[in-house]
Amino acid sequence: MFPLLERYTSDLGGPNTQRGHVDDPTHKQILVNAKICPIINAPSWREEKGLMDRFWSIFTLGRFGVADSLGAYDFYNEDEVVVATSAEEYIELSEYYIKNVDKQLPFIEKIQKRIREEYNWYYTWRHILENIE
């Protein structure tokens, strides 16, 4: 992320940042106003192909981010989500979508549609209950 931070204005909150910790409403406002929202998993999550809750929060808010875990493909097809598999590719894709915000919308819409229709508590519990023997 450091190359992007050097080239673009950013609003970072959290430990060891100039802003420090932010409350939930402030965090939501930062995400809503961002051109791109980083979705960077811990190395262990990437290794296990996990997908942290930040992914879901960002897209639920109608924002966009490049994911760094192949675990995104467990939920979405390649035409529905943008995934980078190296730091260089992550920077390259992030910069592309910062400069081309209009290209984000199809991904946001596809992911939100699937969240509404498939990845919610109602769907999950119905699926669990239907499959209990």
Write out the residue ranges for each language-model feature.
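CheY-like receiver
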Residues: 30, 93-96, 131
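Short, hydrophobic/aromatic alpha-helical segments in well-folded domains
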Residues: 54, 93, 110-111
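A charged, aromatic-enriched C-terminal amphipathic alpha-helix characteristic of glycosyltransferases
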Residues: 98-132
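A short acidic/histidine/glycine-rich donor-binding loop in glycosyltransferase catalytic cores
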Residues: 78-84, 96
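Nucleotide-sugar donor-binding catalytic core of glycosyltransferases
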Residues: 1-78, 125
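Short beta->alpha linker loops
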Residues: 22, 85-88
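C-terminal "capping" alpha-helix adjacent to the active site of nucleotide-linked donor transferases
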Residues: 87-103
